[in-house]
Structure formats: C-alpha cells, structure tokens
Amino acid sequence: MGRPPCCDKSNVKKGLWTEEEDAKILAYVAIHGVGNWSLIPKKAGLNRCGKSCRLRWTNYLRPDLKHDSFSTQEEELIIECHRAIGSRWSSIARKLPGRTDNDVKNHWNTKLKKKLMKMGIDPVTHKPVSQLLAEFRNISGHGNASFKTEPSNNSILTQSNSAWEMMRNTTTNHESYYTNSPMMFTNSSEYQTTPFHFYSHPNHLLNGTTSSCSSSSSSTSITQPNQVPQTPVTNFYWSDFLLSDPVPQVVGSSATSDLTFTQNEHHFNIEAEYISQNIDSKASGTCHSASSFVDEILDKDQEMLSQFPQLLNDFDY
C-alpha cells in the first residue's frame, strides 16, 4: 500500500502559520538543524505535517531569503533564463541567491509576463508579435500575396468587361434560340422570350412510345431552328407510335393483357389531359402547332373509344 498523505492524518492543523509556530520551528532548526521533516513537527511541538514545515522553512523562514522586491538585474536575468530554458523555476532560482522557485514563478506571472506583453513581445517565444503574425501568414499561405503584384485598375476593368460580354453573348444566344424555335411563334412577327415546357406526369406509367414521340419532335425542332412552319404538321398520327401488336391479338388475349391495355389507355388519357391543361395555362395562343397535335391526339382517342366499347365499359373514369 502507498503511504497516505501527511495532511490526512487526524488532529493536524492546516491553514496559515502563526508567529508562535514560526518561533518554534526557528528555535528547533537553530539547535538541531534541518533533518527529517517528518519527525521535526513532533520534536518541535508543532501540530503540523512534515511537508507543511518544510515548505514554511524553505519559502519563508530561511535566514538567507530576500523579502524585498526584485531588482532590475534580477528581472533581466529571469527573462534571459526563461528565454533559454522556459518555465524551469527551480533552475532559475538557483541563479538568484536568496530567491525561491515560488518567488520567481509568482514574480513572472504577476509582473514580468505583463511587462513583456505591453512591450509587444510574446512571453512564450520572446519574439515580437508582428514577427509572429508574419510567420503565421507565411505558414497559412496568406503571405504569398506580398510576393505577387497587385492587379491594376485597368486589368480589373478588363476582367469585368469580359465577364459582362460573356453574359451578353449567352443571353443573345438564348434569345436567338427561342426566336428561331418553331414552337414559340404565334405569327411571323411575334414571339415569346420564355421557352415552352411540356411537363411530364409524375407517375411514369406509359410505354416508351411517348418518350420516343417527344424525342423525335424535339430533335426536329433543334436540327431545323431557322424553319418557321406556316401550317401544322398533320402527315402522321399518334397511333403510329403505339406498340406494333395487332388489334385482334389484343382483343383475343387473356384478361391480364386486356387490363394492361386499358390501364395504358387510361393513363394515356390522363397524360393527354395534363398536357392540354399545361398548354392552355402556360402557352395559350402561342403554340398553334402543339395545340393542333394535342387535338389530333384527343380525336384519335375518341375514335379508339368508339371502336372498342366492349373493353372499356366495365371501368369508371
């Protein structure tokens, strides 16, 4: 087992020392000298622990201690030693006769450190604060700016002008694209500056035929941007893009295939209504060809419903 702390013993006094206690320890040391500090309290008649007696003698009661303030030479020596070896107060105190390590440490923390900070010197590295800031900038990469020539006002203006020129060219290209697009004309002299968007339904339940139709129409409008159609294109029908399965096979198939066909037809009707609503709300009167295409889809839809009434009578829309 380890030795318990001496201050934990029973009936041991703690706190400030009195003049009577100081006189007892001084008298004992004057007669017997410094020896085993754990036995001195009992022999001197002190109700103190050995550690407390040793610290009291070393830091306050020794006859060679100096109790006056530190001189200028002592302060300079403390600063030089601290610059060389750091906070090794015992080693610094050995160079100062009559001073304890506790005295040196307290004087450094209360006086000398603040004095150096007021002089613009870092108390840890003993370097000027301005030099430390410069080194920090070099380490962090900010100091490279001092080795670079600052751009003149003319170069800044040139960069800003080039940026504005790029933005102007981009805007002009967009306007020319929407101007020449066949989907944007209402007549030969008026056009919209905002593009027309077909919004797809959130539930993608249709076949790939709708995407192929839209991709073919978009590729036509992109490859021929300068051609303005005078009449709507009606040389194709939306039924040409359906699946290539023959109609009798669909009619004679099982109930599962009939249900799939009717579901596709139902969702296609929803998609057509959704597209027509978007056309009416966002591009009313501005896309004649698109509206005619949707009208063609709706007409063919009604024609299919009239041709296959036996497939759609059992479902409510």
Curated annotation (Swiss-Prot):
Q: What does this protein do?
A: Required for anther development and early tapetal function during microspore maturation. Regulates callose dissolution required for microspores release from the tetrads.
Briefly explain the null phenotype. Answer: Male-sterile mutant, defective in tapetal development, characterized by irregular and excessive division, redundant cells and leading to dysfunction of the tapetum. Impaired callose dissolution resulting in altered microspores release from the tetrads and no pollen production.
- CDD domains, A to Z: SANT
Keywords of this entry: Developmental protein, DNA-binding, Nucleus, Repeat, Transcription, Transcription regulation
Which is an annotated Pfam family here?
Answer: Myb_DNA-binding
Q: What is its main location?
A: nucleus
Where is the protein found, in the record's own terms? Nucleus
What GO cellular component entries does it have? nucleus
Q: Which organism is it from?
A: Arabidopsis thaliana
GO MF annotation, one: DNA binding
Provide one Gene Ontology biological process annotation: anther wall tapetum development
SUPFAM superfamilies in alphabetical order: Homeodomain-like
Question: What InterPro entries does the database record attribute to this sequence?
Answer: Homeodomain-like_sf (IPR009057), Myb_dom (IPR017930), Myb_TF_plants (IPR015495), SANT/Myb (IPR001005)
User: Is Transcription regulation a UniProt keyword of this protein?
Assistant: yes
User: Where in the numbering of this chain does the HTH myb-type domain appear?
Assistant: 9-65, 66-116
Q: Which residues bind DNA?
A: 37-61, 89-112
What is this protein called in UniProt? Transcription factor MYB35
